[in-house]
Amino acid sequence: MGKIIFYEDRNFQGRNYECSSDCADLSPYFSRCNSIRVESDWWVLYEKPNYMGYQHVLTRGEYPDYQRWMGFNDCVRSCRVPTHTQRPYRMRIYERPDFGGQMMEFMDVCPSVYDRFRYRDIHSSHVMGAYWIFYEHPNYRGRLYFMRPGEYRRYSDWGGYSSTIGSFRRIME
């Protein structure tokens, strides 16, 4: 079972809250989050309640201030600890919504979507195994989107504000 500790102040100071499962609304437990300890597993943090807004993936370790996890501010309002999966890594991406247009299937990382797909936009995706992360820019940079197994008919289904994806990779457990 995963465990994460949220602290209101930097360097693990101030009020704290320990969490060991998914939580759709963290606001009753703390008003701001400036440092985090991930004691086991890996976690997905969300800027807004109900797993919405900016996303951050944290692995086991210490994060003494929000800039260490590439946070834009001290706002963490929901979190998930993904369950372990033995599925193979496989994902299809499409150039149009509702699985339309050109399709490519991937089983490995992609540092540049444009170099492999010849498009910068991914409008829909079908994740058939394990977990993946989409990045806004090439070489795993920029805003990220956590992709669980399932069908994503539009980029808004994975929390995107735009269809532009520059790179993606698998999450190794």
From Swiss-Prot:
Chain positions covered by the region annotation Connecting peptide: 84-88
Domain Beta/gamma crystallin 'Greek key': 2-40, 41-83, 89-129, 130-172
GO MF annotations in UniProt: structural constituent of eye lens
InterPro entries named among the record's database cross-references: Beta/Gamma-Crystallin, Beta/gamma_crystallin, G_crystallin-like
GO BP term (any one): lens development in camera-type eye
Claim: Metal-binding is one of the keywords in the record: no
PROSITE patterns registered for this protein in UniProt: CRYSTALLIN_BETA_GAMMA
Keyword check for tRNA processing: no
Keywords recorded for this protein, A-Z: Eye lens protein, Repeat
Pfam families for the chain: Crystall
Domain notes: Has a two-domain beta-structure, folded into four very similar Greek key motifs.
Family: Belongs to the beta/gamma-crystallin family.
Function noted in UniProt: Crystallins are the dominant structural components of the vertebrate eye lens.
Protein name: Gamma-crystallin S-2
Gene this protein is translated from: GS-2
